[in-house]
Amino acid sequence: MLCPLNRKVEIRNLFIMAKFQFSTFIFHLSKLLVGATFVFSGFVKAIDPLGTTYKIQDYLEVMHLSWFSELALVASFALITAEFLAGMLLITNVNFKLGLWLSSLLMIAMTPLTLWIAIKNPVTDCGCFGDAIILSNWATFWKNIVLDVLIIGLWLLQKRLYNPW
């Protein structure tokens, strides 16, 4: 004869296990989505680094910082490398925490920039994905908000779920 108390414990354990599996699924899905976005963005920009340089120069010009234009090529390669590296680190789990920090820092810089671009509309295209995918300024901002939410989720879940092996 089954004890009702044991049955409640079994149901509770099943609920806890399902909750853990759902959290694990969300963690890995978020990691793949953020990582793939950064890898794709870095890869597309790497195909045409001069195009990225010109886009950075456009941004510097509308912000009245054209005297930084000489550093646009260096900034282009730094951005390409940072995006691609952040994505690869998240996807491959080689150094997940570094990838999470790098993607967080990129989004801390890019989200306010895209909000300003969406409100003021100084450039027609953000250049997030080079010439492969052209997004409106507001679409870019909302894409960044989604990435921010996913990255916050990764920060919240990583302590409980992250296992490098």
Language-model segments: what does each one mean?
Residues 12-22:
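Short, Lys/Arg-rich, polar N-terminal cytosolic tail immediately upstream
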Residues 99, 160-165:
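Membrane-interfacial entry segments at the cytosolic side of transmembrane helices
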Residues 108-162:
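Membrane-embedded alpha-helical segments of integral membrane proteins
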Residues 53-70:
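Perimembrane loop-to-helix junctions flanking transmembrane segments
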Residues 20, 24-27, 122:
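Solvent-exposed, non-transmembrane interaction/regulatory regions
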Residues 26-46, 72-113:
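Functionalized membrane-embedded alpha-helices
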